[in-house]
């Protein structure tokens, strides 16, 4: 690395574990961190207010970290990583342990700063989080990268497709298809077939069993399903 100081200025890191000074007000923490990156106190305070307001913790600015909830500590660490306007933000499990409402709020914030030009590297075990936020995705299995592609390519790579089928009569024969069929109730089922199987073929097979199809809906494959498929290859 030829220019470590310049590189450091370009990167913000949010670790999974809390590493905060528990005994000083969080606004003071932000000013101190800003100083490390060459910001004046005035500049650091201005940026802190902007970040704290965006993250919903401005009203806690005079509190110490030990007085904050887990979700507030998480947001403080995100603000701390952004105090110097980095070009790259590395997030390690940023929404671990937070409730659903806060997770959605944080996702919106990540989308906002990404749209503003910040590149984000996100590590997460929440596959829905990856699907919602990521444009490119790598799946690592036992230390090996088994997939590294744009999200749209990954989501279309599944060899299976799932449909919800509604019929006008009772489904009694699960052997209509060789593929996986899960009976939801008397007149509907969830059917997983090869991607090459057309809707016409599905309807024809039901008709051959004297069952009329009223409706057939595509159920989008979830990233969880694709993850299992990729890691079991």
Give the residues covered by each predicted segment.
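Conserved ABC ATPase "signature" region
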Residues: 31, 35, 42-60
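Conserved ABC ATPase signature
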Residues: 64-68
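Hydrophobic anchor residue at the start of the ABC signature
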Residues: 78
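Conserved catalytic motifs of ABC-family nucleotide-binding domains
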Residues: 85
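Catalytic Walker B motif of ABC-type/P-loop ATPase nucleotide-binding domains
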Residues: 89-92
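ABC transporter nucleotide-binding domain
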Residues: 107-193
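Short, charged/small-residue-rich alpha-helical element at the C-terminal edge
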Residues: 159-233
């Amino acid at each position: 690395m030829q220019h470590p100081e310049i590189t450091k200025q370009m990167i913000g890191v949010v670790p999974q574990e809390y590493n905060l000074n528990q005994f000083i007000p969080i606004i003071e923490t932000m000013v101190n961190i800003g100083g490390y990156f060459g910001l004046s106190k005035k500049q650091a305070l201005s940026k802190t207010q902007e970040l704290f307001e965006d993250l919903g913790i401005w009203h806690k600015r005079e509190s110490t970290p030990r007085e904050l909830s887990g979700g507030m500590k998480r947001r403080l660490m995100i603000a701390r990583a952004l105090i110097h306007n980095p070009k790259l933000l590395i997030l390690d499990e940023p929404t671990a342990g937070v409730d659903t409402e806060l997770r959605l709020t944080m996702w919106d914030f990540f989308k906002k700063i990404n749209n503003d030009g910040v590149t984000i590297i996100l590590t997460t075990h929440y596959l829905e989080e990856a699907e919602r936020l990521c444009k490119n995705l790598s799946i690592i299995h036992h230390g090996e990268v088994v997939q590294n592609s744009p999200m749209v390519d990954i989501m279309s790579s599944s060899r299976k497709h799932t449909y919800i089928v509604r019929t006008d009569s009772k489904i009694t024969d699960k052997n209509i298809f060789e593929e996986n069929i899960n009976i939801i109730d008397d007149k509907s089922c969830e059917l997983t077939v090869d991607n090459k199987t057309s809707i016409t073929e599905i309807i024809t097979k039901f008709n051959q069993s004297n069952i009329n199809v009223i409706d057939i809906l595509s159920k989008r494959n979830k990233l969880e399903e694709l993850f299992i498929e990729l890691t079991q290859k």
